[in-house]
Amino acid sequence: MPKHIGIVACSAEGAALCYRTLCAEAPVKMGTHTHPEVSMHTYPLSDYMTHIRSGNWTQVAELMLSSVQKLATMGAEFAVCPDNTIHQAFDLVTEKSPIPWLHIAETVAQEARSRGFQNLALTGTKYLMTSFVYPNILEKSNISCRIPEGDKQEKIDTIIFEELVNGVFLEGSRLYFNQVIQEFKDKGYDVDVLTLVPTYPL
């Protein structure tokens, strides 16, 4: 019997992609038109951004914990959060959570190991790229992680918050991401971990 999944959402675009992906891929294992029961809860992105910008991860954790408590009440048996940035509050949440969570970086590490990847590049919000979220997890698997240089971090962050979270992805931005990815590839990195809301247009 598949478990009831609870999605702790942050940005609408990221949460929508997570939900669509679950429902699109589940039938491969579960049968036509079949997917697990899924519930979702989200506070406005602005609520999260107020605390993210001030570096108040305790308050970010409180929002996440409130969401997961609502999801547990709905019957969710475990939680996923498709937002990489707020995983900086992950440990503060899980110690009080009524249900278990999947950690997004642990899932990436598992996939990297299965494919034999040793050198990963990481692109995402500046809050994520300069955080411990991925390095701490990847190091346990002897996987290295590299982020873009400072000026590139700022441009990527701007594109995410001015375009991607609003469902917009301009051609110039798409080409810029492809350029950054190609630079990492030329330096010998196995793959770029695109920790951003919808990147499928790439």
PLM region spans:
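Non-catalytic structural scaffold of enzyme domains
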Residues: 1-202
